[in-house]
């Protein structure tokens, strides 16, 4: 199967705000019709940004559920040094993201992230540094670093069960 690597992923940037807003509603539609999702603590989210949402990363589908839970446009930070299968290549292209090389952090990643926070927007990050599937990895330090520099609170979030979210959805079972 064809994959897209660091050259493609490293060139991506977040899409315009209105586009991410539309995609948030697509996530709401998909999440509410194809999967059974329970959200707890949504009332604890800040009423307006900026803030950094830090979430575990057990599934390739986590960004969809992340968007579903927050229900506002999110600027994701995502690894550019990975391979993405053709089946999933549309997602980073359509949504866009702030690319980060997990082996060497570039100043442009920090600048883009701080720009998001200065505009009062939401920054989404998976501190694990990649999909870990069933174990929490030791978090990277970037979440706290960006929160401090951007003077934005960190909102913790957890997703579980996303890897099984689509089971039975084609049969009408949610």
Predicted regions located by residue number:
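A transmembrane-helix-recognition feature enriched in membrane-embedded lipid enzymes
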Residues: 2-41, 65, 86-95
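Short, basic, glycine/proline-bearing loop/turn elements
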Residues: 26-28, 94-100, 126-131
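Catalytic core of membrane glycerolipid acyltransferases/transacylases, capturing the structured
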Residues: 45-104, 112
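Residue-level preference for the first positions of well-ordered beta-strands
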Residues: 50-52, 120-126, 155
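Hydrophobic/aromatic ligand-binding patch that stacks against planar heteroaromatic rings
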Residues: 66, 91, 115, 145-150
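Internal catalytic-core helix/loop-beta-alpha segment
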Residues: 102, 109-110, 114-136, 144
